[in-house]
């Protein structure tokens, strides 16, 4: 535990120092910041804010995790594969951000390109990950999936990678939501005695807390796809490494809700010829524009943040109740 906490502190400090340096470099190089293409008027003031800040906490967490795991003899297959997903999905996000920021391609990678790269990473993860079988744990019951586990693994990794990406829409929301999710998995890893996984979790929590110092409203930097895609893939990989895949549906309810809102909105829009369920999706924008009902007073970003963080925290506590009390 001491080693894991120490790794978290080091990553926190590295990110705390690294982000200001990153922002300064961004400004001096006169790199065009985040472009705003949303209908939320108050977001237009954020145009030009440095993005790709996730690169800082990602590098810090990966390097610290690797070195500490190596010297403490905890560089297991679990650690290696979680770090692999972080690096690969981070690279996908970096390429997406790079095209948007430097090549001025608003779309970045097109959906097919992004999906292909994410699937490639998922296949490599599956081939090298030593699970010890293709069993899926569902509420304590073991379900043998056989060859179909690879389909599940790809769906899980790609799905949650993109889900966290959708959640990263207002200042601080994704960073602390993931801190809450990682903390929940930290408890599960500790109970299982998987200190190697706990090490990586603490390292990333430290990095995210250091990043949040500059990402809370008003954000001085955004994590970009390089951060959000990597974090979503990490959560999926950790749930698989702990053999508690189903828990991510509850622990990650915020990301599930965000993604489902987009799917519902698009489907309903097509079926009804232009009608909408929500004011705007992902659903955090719906709350921004008109509160819970979408027709009331607009919520501040802080209010939306605390609402979603609260939901994530309660969902984590519910997961513990199901796992350890029921």
UniProtKB/Swiss-Prot annotation:
Its cofactor is Mg(2+). The chain crosses the membrane at residues 3-23, 51-71, 79-99, 115-135, 138-158, 169-189, 195-215, 221-243, 306-326. GO terms for biological process: cell division; cell wall organization; peptidoglycan biosynthetic process; regulation of cell shape. It catalyses: UDP-N-acetyl-alpha-D-muramoyl-L-alanyl-gamma-D-glutamyl-L-lysyl-D-alanyl-D-alanine + di-trans,octa-cis-undecaprenyl phosphate = Mur2Ac(oyl-L-Ala-gamma-D-Glu-L-Lys-D-Ala-D-Ala)-di-trans,octa-cis-undecaprenyl diphosphate + UMP. InterPro entries: Glycosyl_transferase_4, PNAcMuramoyl-5peptid_Trfase, PNAcMuramoyl-5peptid_Trfase_CS. One of its GO terms (molecular function) is phospho-N-acetylmuramoyl-pentapeptide-transferase activity. It comes from the Bacteria. It is found in: Cell membrane. The keyword Chloroplast does not apply. GO terms for cellular component: plasma membrane. The keyword Transmembrane applies. Keywords: Cell cycle, Cell division, Cell membrane, Cell shape, Cell wall biogenesis/degradation, Magnesium, Membrane, Metal-binding, Peptidoglycan synthesis, Transferase, Transmembrane, Transmembrane helix. It is an enzyme of class 2 (transferase). Its EC number is 2.7.8.13. Its main location: membrane. It is a multi-pass membrane protein. CDD domains: GT_MraY. Pathway: Cell wall biogenesis; peptidoglycan biosynthesis. Belongs to the glycosyltransferase 4 family. MraY subfamily. Catalyzes the initial step of the lipid cycle reactions in the biosynthesis of the cell wall peptidoglycan: transfers peptidoglycan precursor phospho-MurNAc-pentapeptide from UDP-MurNAc-pentapeptide onto the lipid carrier undecaprenyl phosphate, yielding undecaprenyl-pyrophosphoryl-MurNAc-pentapeptide, known as lipid I. HAMAP family: MraY (MF_00038). NCBIfam families: mraY. This is Phospho-N-acetylmuramoyl-pentapeptide-transferase. It comes from Streptococcus pneumoniae (strain Taiwan19F-14).
